[in-house]
Amino acid sequence: MTPISITLLLLLFVIILFITEKLPLAVTSMIALITLVLTGVLSPKDAFAGFVDNNLILFVAMFIIGGAFFETGMANKTGGIVTKFAHSERELIVAVMTVTGLMSGFLSNTGTAAVLIPVVIGIAAKSGFARSRLLLPLIFAAAMGGNLSLIGAPGNLLGKSALQAIGADIGFFEYGYVGLPILVVGIAFFATVGYKFLPNKKPGSEGESVYDEAQDFSSVPAWKQKASLIIMVLTIIAMIFEKQIGIKFYLSGCIGAIILVATGVISEKQAYKSIDLQTLFVYGGTLALAKALEKTGAGAYIADSVIGLLGSNASPFMLLAVVLLLSCVMTNFMSNFATAALLIPISLNISAAMGADPKAVIVATVIGSSLAFATPIGMPANMMVFAPGGYTFNDYVKAGLPMVIVGYIVSLILLPILFPFYH
């Protein structure tokens, strides 16, 4: 069997298992990596290169920095302060989505949701508001906020890695040029028209969950909470001014993480616990698959096939619409990170074949992969509110599908202006 055939079969295998999740995503990714080595498609050095990638090092550092923000209770306090100013259900939706979106722009989407879910449940219980109308906007905002910065979501860094491999790059806030408008429009949507699509389940009819009991952070010293916030802010500032200060962004992350552990703001055990190993293995494994797609020509073959279906005279707008639609559809039936991991190398090949700006195609792919609102399986946070909100699958479709369409339209308008496919 030829290397290109092996790579295409492995890609199909990964897609099927990513969708069905018959095996954990990390296991599927590693099966693909090991198979590429055993069949000789990739050398061990090329296959495992993703595990010493700069962005994977940044993942580890930011997991620890985010973990300190969560473990000290600073994230909980931040959410509680903001939501105190909301006096009606719609005002609370705006407050919850705003704080969630901003936090998830720099922290783990799942971690942000996990911290704010009990805060929102507590407020709903005290005020008599239906938690079912608050929890879906919360997780949707977590996904939207992930596009505010380079470190907001794992897929963003996958895009950066892919661009760096071809000598290009993307700035710290460039995803936010499209991500912020989507978040603002999303908040406005659920405060107005979208409010009607949110399920209104009577208090008490929602499911029980582990989030019903809020964590007690009263024993955590105030200096630890302040330190976690200050170090996180300073780390982000250092990343933004990477070129000016001469320290690579991943090293700034490492310095911040080391300071937090060394000063005892977060214990070594808590630091290890905060690292999401699945993300690291999926990242490393899918980078190997991306390398195989490039090396064997399988990626170029897929790109040529897509272009063949579009026609040789396809307009840039048509190409954008197709790339964005493919990302949107796939991300609602498999992990948003897995969608980005699979589509980014293919998108790069499409851009090369059509002579389009690779950054434009990558940004479209990453943004589309974040619009995982229409099903409970698009991202982990979606499933986290399933029981406490008392939701059904159709609740996600009814509230989330309109938001997917809104996000798609906003992207179609902004991407050609901010990231044109052709200059």
Question: PLM ranges: what are they?
Answer:
Residues 1, 173-186, 317-329:
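Hydrophobic alpha-helical transmembrane segments
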Residues 1-60, 64, 177-304, 403-404, ...:
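Hydrophobic transmembrane alpha-helices of multi-pass small-molecule transporters
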Residues 6, 91, 127-140, 145-158, ...:
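Juxtamembrane and boundary regions of transmembrane helices in multi-pass small-molecule transporters
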Residues 12-21, 67-85, 121-126, 193-194, ...:
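C-terminal ends of transmembrane helices
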Residues 14-23, 99-109, 140-151, 238-244, ...:
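Transmembrane alpha-helix interface/packing and boundary motifs in multi-pass membrane proteins
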Residues 31, 95, 99, 137-140, ...:
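Hydrophobic residues within alpha-helical transmembrane segments
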Residues 34, 38-130, 274-279, 283-354:
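Membrane-embedded alpha-helical segments and adjacent helix-loop junctions characteristic
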Residues 44, 90, 131, 172, ...:
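Alpha-helix N-cap/start motif
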